[in-house]
Amino acid sequence: MSGKRVVVGMSGGVDSSVTAWLLKQQGYEVIGLFMKNWEDDDDSEYCSTRQDWIDVVSVADLIGVDVEAVNFAAEYKDRVFADFLREYSAGRTPNPDVLCNAEIKFKAFLDHAMALGADTIATGHYARVREAGGRFELLKAFDHTKDQSYFLHRLNQAQLSRTLFPLGEMPKTRVREIAAEIGLPNARKKDSTGICFIGERPFRDFLNRYLPTKPGPIRTPDGKTIGQHIGLAFYTLGQRKGIGIGGSRDGNGDAWYVARKDMAANTLYVAQGHDHPWLLAHTVHADDLSWVAGHPPAEGTQLAAKTRYRQADAPCAVTRATGDALTLTFQQAQWAVTPGQSAVLYDGDICLGGGIIASTEAASLEQAVA
């Protein structure tokens, strides 16, 4: 690969640092690019942007690559954060990492890299790209425990054709070993968590800065009022902690879970017990679809899906896939399927794409106990 120029998204973390080193070893001309996609945190105790940039520069000096910083804060707010707030305001629970990958890391970043004369880009994501018959497939990572294809399912053929995922073929333990072996200064740095580019702030405090609170009743499925919520945007389906109603009511010690939101009545419904029927769904409807191959799978196809990150693949049938509407029917009832999250389809290790969960249909009693 001598002479090929690759621009690597370097975050200051171990994964992107090892990615840059591996590509340098393979003969690529490597340029590191540090993305700053959030502006309002420079004085925050939760901000790590400055330290991340210091780590990027230290790694670049050690492995001998050029590095520069680019500010995509305006693009992030317009393309990702505005949608994030709209979804929460509508009572849904979005996954901004999915949109951030499609709009920032593999669009704004890719465009910038091409302007730098890059032949390709690379990131530290755990996933794989395979060319087959002139088309590109997105595959799960070799290390399924770290697989990030769920977050990448909106990537298209043009994006995948210009993308490398060097870590996709190795376990995370080996990445840490390489970092230590070559003496990376961030070899022991913990993996980042929290919302994409927003960090590890207490989420409720962060959201409260942008969305107004509108308290309302908390009710049980039979309509009994048992508390007051602070605003529907601050709760998500399946949530157990932080509801504020205690752990035992109606003579039953089972935990309470957020089960439904009635936006029109500003009412939060909670159900008692992990396997309450209100928490189970057999059919999932999604829209805002995106397919890696550019077209949906055929109706009637038996596949598997994830309706949240780190969920085990769940067998399902594609019962509708026309236009911008997708319906999945699962063999077994799925727990706390949440509107706003992504439903992502897989054929074995191949990630086909998916869409944003719009609504669900409750499981029957037989399906609920299966």
UniProtKB/Swiss-Prot annotation:
The EC number(s) this enzyme carries: 2.8.1.13
Primary subcellular site in the record, as a coarse category: cytoplasm
A Gene Ontology molecular function term of the record: tRNA binding
Annotated catalysed reactions: S-sulfanyl-L-cysteinyl-[protein] + uridine(34) in tRNA + AH2 + ATP = 2-thiouridine(34) in tRNA + L-cysteinyl-[protein] + A + AMP + diphosphate + H(+)
Coiled coil: none
Record site: Interaction with tRNA: H125, Q341
InterPro entries, per the entry: MnmA-like (IPR004506), MnmA-like_C (IPR046885), MnmA-like_central (IPR046884), MnmA-like_central_sf (IPR023382), Rossmann-like_a/b/a_fold (IPR014729)
Cystine pairs: C100-C196
Chain spans, region Interaction with target base in tRNA: 95-97
GO cellular component: cytoplasm
GO BP term, pick one: tRNA wobble position uridine thiolation
Keyword Calcium set for record: no
Keywords in alphabetical order: ATP-binding, Cytoplasm, Disulfide bond, Nucleotide-binding, RNA-binding, Transferase, tRNA processing, tRNA-binding
Keyword ATP-binding appears in the UniProt entry: yes
Subcellular location: Cytoplasm
Residues annotated to bind ATP: G9, M10, S11, G12, G13, V14, D15, S16, M35, G124
Annotated family: Belongs to the MnmA/TRMU family.
Protein name listed in UniProt: tRNA-specific 2-thiouridylase MnmA
Gene: mnmA
